[in-house]
Amino acid sequence: GYAPRQRFDLSVNILTNNAINKKKITVFGGKQLRPNLHIQDYCDVVKLFLSAPSEKINNQIFNVGYQNMSISEISEIVKRVVQKEFSLYKEIPIITTKSDDNRSYHINSDKIKQILGFKPNRSVEDAVKELCISFKKGLFKNSIDNDFYFNVKRLKRIQAS
């Protein structure tokens, strides 16, 4: 979803950015899993930790995620939502290519639900809809090439200067 310090190097965000600006989605591999958590749900977790009794969270490690999905599943959601939100985009193709990057992440967040009662309220679809609205408002300038939105590119530029 939208964030004041937007990143387009995260799976949902980069796929949405490409669907809107390149009018296509390129998926490298596609079977890799990613846990997803909406930025507002993450903010809710931070508030929850700040207000939680210390005896419940002291020396504890919590996974916080939601919707473990494959990159291919995410790309299908992005395609559907962007085509709906941008009616001029009749058909956004999904191009799947081979990938040398087979990293796959999935997590179990049952512990935070059991101990603190946390359950995310927002979905990947909600995040894509928010991004579409933000793009329509013109909130992202040159979001394909501007290294402001890409942590590794930004750090390399800063390091080189």
Specify the residue positions occupied by each region the protein language model found.
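C-terminal substrate-binding subdomain of Rossmann-fold SDR/epimerase-dehydratase oxidoreductases
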Residues: 22-23, 27-161
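Flexible, glycine-rich beta-alpha linker
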Residues: 1-10
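Active-site Tyr-X1-5-Lys
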Residues: 17-21
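Short beta-strand/turn micro-motifs at beta-sheet edges
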Residues: 14-15, 99
